[in-house]
Amino acid sequence: MNKQSGMTLLEVLLAMSIFTAVALTLMSSMQGQRNAIERMRNETLALWIADNQLQSQDSFGEENTSSSGKELINGEEWNWRSDIHSSKDGTLLERTITVTLPSGQTTSLTRYQSIDNKSGQAQDD
């Protein structure tokens, strides 16, 4: 009698389980990479919004003031808030722009400006 060659049922099941484990691991890794790319995209857009606000609001204005607004990018609404405070030693004004991402996370960008002690006005360095 001729002996047939091939895989037994046990070998087929083992090969299928190994393939399934590898496929699930790859899918999980790809999902993690996709989430990381989305977070980096949102972080970059938030920093662009904050930088644009710092550039458009070139003068610092009064200390201990706040303002806020919204930007629409790619159909998503991004909220920003500008806060101006003086430093503890009174030589610098600090403007912080905080952008709230659509997911609820926040990103901040800060700019410092020296204060001219004679006039009390802020001046760029």
From Swiss-Prot:
> Where is this gene product found?
Cell inner membrane
> Which PROSITE patterns does the UniProt record give?
PROKAR_NTER_METHYL
As for membrane topology, the entry says: Single-pass membrane protein
Out of the domains of life, which is the source? Bacteria
Pfam families per record: N_methyl, T2SSI
The UniProt transmembrane annotation reads 7-27
Q: Describe how it is modified after translation.
A: Cleaved by prepilin peptidase. Methylated by prepilin peptidase at the amino group of the N-terminal methionine once the leader sequence is cleaved by prepilin peptidase.
Instruction: Name the Gene Ontology biological process terms.
Output: protein secretion by the type II secretion system
> Where are the N-methylmethionine modifications?
7
The protein's UniProt keywords, in alphabetical order, are: Cell inner membrane, Cell membrane, Membrane, Methylation, Protein transport, Transmembrane, Transmembrane helix, Transport
Self-association or partners: how does it assemble? Type II secretion is composed of four main components: the outer membrane complex, the inner membrane complex, the cytoplasmic secretion ATPase and the periplasm-spanning pseudopilus. Interacts with core component GspG.
Under what name is this protein listed? Putative type II secretion system protein I
